[in-house]
Amino acid sequence: MTKLEDHLEGIINIFHQYSVRTGHYDTLSKCELKKLITTELVNTIKNTKDQATVDRIFRDLDEDGDHQVDFKEFLSLLASVLVTAHENIHKE
């Protein structure tokens, strides 16, 4: 497995580490998303402890309005985080 493929598998595994806790095993509830963000993205997303921030992120990600974030919706967050990280690297 290449380094990139290994990282992709890691992202999937982290998603599932949190998605299996409550409700459907392949989606994140708001509580699961908050736990993932506050644990895994604490240095990347500002105000992760603020419930209003988590609510806004969840609302933005939940494109179909089912009160769950599936993997495809979660990828929107990762894409945004990666773009910001890439831009920040070039600022340094």
UniProtKB/Swiss-Prot annotation:
Positions of the EF-hand domain:
16-48, 49-84
Binding of Zn(2+), residues: H16, D26, H86, H90
Q: Highest taxon of the source?
A: Eukaryota
**Alphabetized GO MF terms:** calcium ion binding; calcium-dependent protein binding; RAGE receptor binding
Q: Would the keyword Secreted be found if you checked this record's keyword annotation?
A: yes
Q: Which residues bind Cu cation?
A: H16, D26, H86, H90
> What is the protein's membrane topology class?
Peripheral membrane protein
Cell membrane: is it a keyword of this entry?
yes
Q: Which GO terms describe its biological process?
A: antimicrobial humoral immune response mediated by antimicrobial peptide; endothelial cell migration; inflammatory response; innate immune response; positive regulation of canonical NF-kappaB signal transduction
Q: Which Pfam families match?
A: EF-hand_1, S_100
Give the subcellular location.
Secreted; Cytoplasm; Cytoplasm, Cytoskeleton; Cell membrane
Q: Which InterPro entries match?
A: EF-hand-dom_pair (IPR011992), EF_Hand_1_Ca_BS (IPR018247), EF_hand_dom (IPR002048), S100/CaBP7/8-like_CS (IPR001751), S100_Ca-bd_sub (IPR013787)
Which residues does Ca(2+) 1 bind? S19, H24, T27, E32
Name the residues that bind Ca(2+) 2: D62, D64, D66, Q68, E73
State any GO CC term.
cytoplasm
Q: Provide the alphabetized UniProt keywords.
A: Calcium, Cell membrane, Copper, Cytoplasm, Cytoskeleton, Immunity, Inflammatory response, Innate immunity, Membrane, Metal-binding, Repeat, Secreted, Zinc
What residue spans carry the region label Hinge domain? 38-53
Q: What does this protein do?
A: S100A12 is a calcium-, zinc- and copper-binding protein which plays a prominent role in the regulation of inflammatory processes and immune response. Its pro-inflammatory activity involves recruitment of leukocytes, promotion of cytokine and chemokine production, and regulation of leukocyte adhesion and migration. Acts as an alarmin or a danger associated molecular pattern (DAMP) molecule and stimulates innate immune cells via binding to receptor for advanced glycation endproducts (AGER).
Comment on protein domains: The hinge domain contributes significantly to its chemotactic properties.
- Subunit note: Homodimer. Homooligomer (tetramer or hexamer) in the presence of calcium, zinc and copper ions. Interacts with AGER and both calcium and zinc are essential for the interaction. Interacts with CACYBP in a calcium-dependent manner.
Q: Which PANTHER family match?
A: PROTEIN S100-A12 (PTHR11639:SF77), S100 CALCIUM-BINDING PROTEIN (PTHR11639)
User: What protein name is recorded for this chain?
Assistant: Protein S100-A12
Q: Which organism is it from?
A: Oryctolagus cuniculus
